[in-house]
Amino acid sequence: MTQLPYAVDAETPLNPAELNVLRAQYEKEGEMVGVQTKFNYAWGLVKSNVRADQHLGVMLLSEIFRTSPERRRECLYYLALGNYKLGNYAQARKYNDALLENEPANLQAANLRALIDDKVTKEGLMGVAIISGVAVAAGVIGGVLLRNLGRKR
């Protein structure tokens, strides 16, 4: 991966002790969890390298985004980052573009856009290669079958 100035944030998880502090606070508050505590825990989860953590982080951020309009701006980048890390590039781009629409000079979001675009391009090329390979294989198999049918007659 090309290291962009803010890309380190996308790839640097909290250490387990730091994440455990956030988890403990979240669990301690229980049903009455505060928005800031929930956001902090979601932030730590999104930064994780564990897919289940990332998924939970995106879910918590989505809840904050829906229920706390005053916190939406804060959620946009981490929703974009979480979806990027989960491979949901269309969702990642949607959240990131919403942030860039309001903050066109946001370097973090601009760098995340570059990461998203790079992944989409690479996966698009991979998809084309896979489809091409399947088409070639189908053509070879079809040719062999037709040749064998011709010999039987």
From Swiss-Prot:
Gene Ontology biological process: mitochondrial fission; peroxisome fission
Mitochondrial intermembrane side of membrane: 146-153
Q: What remark about domains does the record contain?
A: The C-terminus is required for mitochondrial localization, while the N-terminus is necessary for mitochondrial fission.
Topological domains on the Cytoplasmic side lie at 1-124
Q: Does the keyword Endoplasmic reticulum apply?
A: no
Q: Name any one Pfam family assigned in the record.
A: Fis1_TPR_C
**Protein family membership:** Belongs to the FIS1 family.
Name assigned to this protein = Mitochondrial fission 1 protein
Any idea what job this protein has? Has a role in mitochondrial fission. Has a role in outer membrane fission but not matrix separation.
Cell compartment(s), UniProt: Mitochondrion outer membrane
Sorted alphabetically, which InterPro entries does this protein's record hold?
Fis1, Fis1_cytosol, Fis1_TPR_C, Fis1_TPR_N, TPR-like_helical_dom_sf
Q: Which residues cross the membrane?
A: 125-145
Query: What's the protein's topology in the membrane?
Result: Single-pass membrane protein
